[in-house]
């Protein structure tokens, strides 16, 4: 069945309808090798639809979920040491899904899982620089100097990070709760940033990836991502 191109592109999870219209206007969309125009229709089952040379297809058969990973679980599908794995929490998903990125065993919060390899690869590719936001708890009060250091580039495993966005959410004599947004996903990056700053990190929770927020999802629980959330993520990783 033929449908407007922007509707097909949106339903495939590539972009919102408005963004799809811009792709069409800019000549990035082809149907069967011919550059498409705004207002064109196509049949995704019989026509070859490409954006920047990449063929798009239906997304209905894929699964996309978010999990609130609790502390103490490893972000793997199995573990030779017998540690709790995230698979213990998603047995009722019904499909074999894989984590997009990682959270270390002692971190918690938002984790995306899917069986869509192309989607996962786009989301993780360094060129897209999707912002990841964490809440971090450190011992004691956080000084102005420490905040300035956290906002500066760090040398982590031979890689120079981009400046982070850091805000104080709560502070008392015993601890400070920070919001830290980073643009890379280096291994244990925030832990190493705190260590180099001289801060003792006691808790780390990822609360957002781009505009996708963990919200009120309880630890150990998962839910399917909405079509709107998938469109937002797709726009951010193009």
PLM features per residue range, with description:
Residues 1-238:
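Basic, flexible Lys/Arg- and Gly-enriched helix-loop patches that mediate nucleic-acid binding at interfaces
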């Amino acid at each position: 069945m033929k449908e407007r191109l922007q509707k097909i592109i949106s339903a495939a999870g590539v972009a919102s309808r408005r963004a799809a219209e811009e792709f069409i206007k800019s000549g990035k969309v082809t149907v069967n090798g011919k550059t498409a125009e705004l207002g064109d229709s196509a049949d995704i089952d019989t026509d070859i639809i490409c954006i920047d040379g990449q063929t798009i297809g239906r997304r209905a058969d894929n699964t996309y979920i978010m999990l609130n990973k609790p502390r103490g679980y490893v972000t793997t599908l199995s573990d030779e040491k017998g540690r709790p794995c995230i698979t213990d929490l998603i047995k009722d998903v019904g499909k074999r899904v894989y984590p997009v990125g990682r959270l270390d065993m002692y971190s918690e919060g938002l984790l995306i899982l899917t069986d869509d390899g192309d989607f996962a690869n786009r989301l993780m590719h360094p060129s897209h620089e999707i912002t990841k936001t964490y809440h971090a708890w450190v011992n004691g009060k956080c000084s102005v100097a420490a905040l300035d250091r956290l906002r500066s580039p760090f040398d982590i495993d031979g890689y120079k990070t981009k400046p982070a966005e850091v805000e104080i959410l709560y502070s008392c004599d015993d601890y400070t709760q920070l919001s830290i947004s980073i643009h890379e996903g280096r291994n244990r990056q925030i832990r190493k940033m705190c260590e180099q700053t001289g801060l003792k990190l006691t808790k780390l929770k990822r609360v957002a990836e781009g505009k996708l927020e963990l919200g009120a999802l309880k630890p150990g629980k998962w839910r399917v991502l909405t079509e709107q959330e998938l469109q937002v993520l797709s726009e951010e990783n193009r």
